[in-house]
Amino acid sequence: MRLDLYVITDGAIGGGRSHAEIARFACAGGADAIQLRDKACGPDALCRIGREIRAITRDTGTLFIVNDRLDVALACGADGVHLGQGDLRVDTARRLAPRPFMIGVSVGNAEEAISAVVAGADYVAASPIFATSSKDDAGPGCGISGLREIRAAVAVPVVAIGGITRDNVAEVIAGGADSIAVISAVVGQPDIVAAARDLRERITTAKEQYREKRDA
């Protein structure tokens, strides 16, 4: 599974575009995964949005994840759910949704990453790497050093999120991230397709350079 660019929807900064429109544009720009995130939306409305995005991502072969709500993820046929530290317990979610359904977990340090994997997480999201205004509850950044510690602690894919832009993405890849998750760097841009395409190209280039340096 290739998971370079992971785009999280956010209607508040999407320039009036719906979650489905954001997802469609991000997929057109080469996003490997779309996460539906809307803290204010009720479950029924979120399911309707989720089904729209599921149709889009099914056509493009893009992974579809729902933030927080396992019930919504299962109801709309998503590929997985992403859980925070204060959400449903990972082991409970895993009992309710066996693999191949995916479970991702936000972690702020190596200890949380190890606990998440032991409980059944398929990937962990090191969050936030840098300070960010896109998520009010993100907390202080763990930095590249924190990312390296998380990468060294677990064998599952590590997604990096928080304050990542086209200008610092190479540094984050060099720090050990398998995937880059963004909100404002894609969703908050005037041209989502172009922003996603540019960022994915930069991720690909950074990974190639990192492999060459590592193997030299």
UniProtKB/Swiss-Prot annotation:
It comes from the Archaea. 2-[(2R,5Z)-2-carboxy-4-methylthiazol-5(2H)-ylidene]ethyl phosphate binds at T132, S133, S134, G163, I183, S184. GO terms for cellular component: cytoplasm. 4-amino-2-methyl-5-(diphosphooxymethyl)pyrimidine binds at Q35, L36, R37, D38, K39, N67, S106, K135. Pathway: Cofactor biosynthesis; thiamine diphosphate biosynthesis; thiamine phosphate from 4-amino-2-methyl-5-diphosphomethylpyrimidine and 4-methyl-5-(2-phosphoethyl)-thiazole: step 1/1. Mg(2+) binds at D68, D87. It is an enzyme of class 2 (transferase). This is Thiamine-phosphate synthase. It comes from Methanoregula boonei (strain DSM 21154 / JCM 14090 / 6A8). The lineage of its organism: Archaea, Methanobacteriati, Methanobacteriota, Stenosarchaea group, Methanomicrobia.
